[in-house]
């Protein structure tokens, strides 16, 4: 279904709805393709950040492969993207492994014990090991794959001098929405820890978290780093598997004000979306999303003193029963009204892949703003989606 779209208002649409904008998506894809060419490396889409399969025909114009971390993602790669996945999982299950193999071109093991258990059943897959460089600049422990006690990867001191003959690659993921300067430092640690095994390998996967589509990303530095790496290790194929970079700033989540309540001088605009259900990273990271037409006011011990003296200041509250399903504060340039739209920017990556139906709250629709200015509804959700999960 396609309906006319007007850039200044969403009033004609039913909210809530995620809207991915085709022109912005193609802009990111074109840039990533250029980076892949200039760095002589393969860039593939990580489904953990973005998996809206009705957009895959667009992706196939720019990239050839994807990365999966489960049987469902591997099947999505083969059945909907049309190419076998580069698959990594923290732990493969016996009853799923053969199906994963059928859907994968590359298969990375998280541990030597998983390798020993499954490698003989891996068929024609190119096999790899995830390694842990014991270095990451990700400050939020929830997202730091190299934090002490991590369950991810094999450290250098636990690798044998001679790798098993069927291990063809290393997988190393230690970034999260990082710049090229961070990768420069990480690469130094990776080579210091693991380069003595590089002669035994055919490929290396530097994982995700490389936010090349962010405006301040230093692409020229990345190109220089890869030129140097290829000079040192000309036989190694290099793979990057970002997720956020593909969908970065490609569209909003549009919500509406359902009610406005006040307690102890704090006004909360209750919306028809939920932070915990539809924007979980906001609470998990946490981070404050950009709201169109509003200024975020830092929430600290002094904020309550500012409330009586700041006009049009609101908390934004979700429509679930979770007490903490709110974030604040935002100052608007006018007084909010019931029925008014509230637009959360950059809500396409790590949202639709992580949403849930807590409280039975209706999932936002998913739409695509096409290049011709029409809005196509890709998916709408209802009671049946909630009921079928509860079978």
Give the label of every model feature segment.
Residues 12-33, 38-42, 50-52, 60-62:
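Conserved N-terminal beta1-alpha1 strand-loop-helix module at the mouth
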Residues 179-185, 213-222, 249-255, 259, ...:
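Short glycine/threonine-rich loop-to-helix capping motif typified by GTGT followed
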Residues 41-203, 217, 232:
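Active-site-proximal beta-alpha core segment in soluble small-molecule metabolic enzymes
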Residues 25, 48, 77, 129, ...:
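Conserved, mostly hydrophobic/aromatic
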Residues 8-9:
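Short, positively charged and aromatic/hydrophobic N-terminal segments
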Residues 242-391:
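Charged (often Lys/Glu-rich) extended helix/loop segments that serve as interaction or gating elements
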Residues 191-245, 249:
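Acidic, glycine-rich loop-and-beta core segments that form the ion-binding/anion-interacting portion
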């Amino acid at each position: 279904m396609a309906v006319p779209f007007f850039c200044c208002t969403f009033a004609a649409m039913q909210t809530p709805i995620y809207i991915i904008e085709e022109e912005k998506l193609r802009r990111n894809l074109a840039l990533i393709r250029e980076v892949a060419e200039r760095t002589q490396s393969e860039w593939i889409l990580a489904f953990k950040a973005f998996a809206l399969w009705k957009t895959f025909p667009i992706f196939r114009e720019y990239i050839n492969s994807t990365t999966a971390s489960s049987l469902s993602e591997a099947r999505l790669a083969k059945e909907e993207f049309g190419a076998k996945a580069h698959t990594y999982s923290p732990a493969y299950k016996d009853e799923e492994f053969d199906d994963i193999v059928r859907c994968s071109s590359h298969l990375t093991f998280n541990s030597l014990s998983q390798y020993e258990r499954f490698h003989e059943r891996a068929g024609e897959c190119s096999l790899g090991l995830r390694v842990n460089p014991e270095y990451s600049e990700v400050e939020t422990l929830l997202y730091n794959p190299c934090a002490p006690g991590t369950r991810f990867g094999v450290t250098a001191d636990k690798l044998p001098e001679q790798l098993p003959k069927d291990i063809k690659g290393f997988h190393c993921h230690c970034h999260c929405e990082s710049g090229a300067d961070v990768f420069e430092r990480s690469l130094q640690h990776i080579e210091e820890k693991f380069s003595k095994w590089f002669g035994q390998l055919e490929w290396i996967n530097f994982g995700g978290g490389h936010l090349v589509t962010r405006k301040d990303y230093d692409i020229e530095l990345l190109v220089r780093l890869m030129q140097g790496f290829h000079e040192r290790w000309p036989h190694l194929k290099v793979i990057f598997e970002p997720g956020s970079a593909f969908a970065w700033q490609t569209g909003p989540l549009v919500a509406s004000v359902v009610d406005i309540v006040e307690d102890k001088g704090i006004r909360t605009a209750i919306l028809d979306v939920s932070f915990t259900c539809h924007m979980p990273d906001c609470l998990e990271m946490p981070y404050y999303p950009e709201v169109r037409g509003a200024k975020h006011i830092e929430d600290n011990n002094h904020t309550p003193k500012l409330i009586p003296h700041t006009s049009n200041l609101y908390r934004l509250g979700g429509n679930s029963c979770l007490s903490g399903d709110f974030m604040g504060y935002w100052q608007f340039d006018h007084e909010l009204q019931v029925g008014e739209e509230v637009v959360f920017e950059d809500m396409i990556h790590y949202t639709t892949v992580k949403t849930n139906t807590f409280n039975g709250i209706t999932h936002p629709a998913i739409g695509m703003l096409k290049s011709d200015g029409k809005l196509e509804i890709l998916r709408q959700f209802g009671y049946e989606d909630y009921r079928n999960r509860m079978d």
